[in-house]
Amino acid sequence: MSIQTTADSRMIQSIFQVVLVSLLVLGSVRWILDELKSKESRISKLYGFRQKEAVFVTKEDQLDESCNVFEGQWVWDNVSYPLYTEKSCPYLVKQTTCQRNGRPDSYYQNWRWKPSSCDLPRFNALKLLDVLRNKRLMFIGDSVQRSTFESMVCMVQSVIPEKKKSFHRIPPMKIFKAEEYNASIEYYWAPFIVESISDHATNHTVHKRLVKLDAIEKHSKSWEGVDVLVFESYVWWMHQPKINATYGDTSEVREYNVTTAYKMALETWAKWFKTKINSEKQKVFFTSMSPTHLWSWEWNPGSDGTCYDELYPIDKRSYWGTGSNQEIMKIVGDVLSRVGENVTFLNITQLSEYRKDGHTTVYGERRGKLLTKEQRADPKNYGDCIHWCLPGVPDTWNEILYAYLLRSHRNFF
């Protein structure tokens, strides 16, 4: 009887211990969950957003190191493209909305860039937003770069609830925010990268240009600490073979050969890069020149037109027009090679050279206004073969940027 009582007592004691441990474990788990919930609540109250659930980036999403995404061809794809439409994206400016402005065809929207040795990962807005979680992505440059910024905003904005996104204009910047990710996509107007008299975002002189080749501080204050920086500067340099500029004493204005001035400006940028960029925390990209298609005789010998009314890409492999300055290309390559591996060169020039069909031509703006009926009838004088329609070619530049961002991304769960 005594032995049985002792056994029962031990069993009860064991059960009690198991129950007690279970309660302690459950209590600890509950406390941790409550703390996490409380922390999220505090973050939500402080920043006005709730963190969006993470999306997993797989190995299949990431480019192989050996893949050259800049060599390939344009293939027709009217199933997967465009990635968005003019109607679906309220952030496009009139300069790029060619369909809305009267362009009769939409073929330019349905070409997909296919690298020769690999495939670009299919663009996924949720995955990009997860890569940009708690980060800032900033595009810096001229109006071509502004189109790249607008393209990227249009590519991601449709997956974000209306009340969880915002768009702010704070000259010389534009800022798109995805609140659930605490992420922003931004644009900074700096057509020469270094300082100039054309730095006002809207009221800038086009013909009288004066560049301060050794001055970058005014701009760079807005770049410091940004997680992903994408630089571009070309078209504004190419208005004339020579350009007025200063170096040192701002009262001494000299006339420089454009390529000489460009090199001096880029070296000023490189000095800033080496002293201010934290390569462990920041990613920096530099985009090559966006080509122009001003003279049709370059791809169609004997003709005397422009890019107006062009419907298809150039199919001549390695085509290179006179609008893309080879010396500037070499300067960029030399300066970036001295900066080292901490900057990624987005060499979009060759793939964009083929796209004579993608420009706004007479379906854009001139000096802030849409072309008149009379001006549209004169594409040789009024057609814009510099800027691009959206959706269009800049979307591909962003798909390539997306591929590079995915390649370096590490999941944290």
Curated annotation (Swiss-Prot):
Where's it found, cell-wise? Membrane
State a GO cellular component annotated for this protein.
Golgi apparatus
What are the protein's UniProt keywords? Membrane, Signal-anchor, Transmembrane, Transmembrane helix
Q: Where, by residue number, is the motif GDS motif? A: 141-143
Chain positions of motif DCXHWCLPGXXDXWN motif: 384-398
Any one Gene Ontology molecular-function term assigned to this protein's record = xylan O-acetyltransferase activity
Example GO biological process term?
Answer: xylan biosynthetic process
Q: Which PANTHER family match?
A: PROTEIN TRICHOME BIREFRINGENCE-LIKE 31, PROTEIN TRICHOME BIREFRINGENCE-LIKE 9-RELATED
Task: Give the protein's recorded name.
Answer: Protein trichome birefringence-like 31
Taxonomic lineage per UniProt?
A: Eukaryota, Viridiplantae, Streptophyta, Embryophyta, Tracheophyta
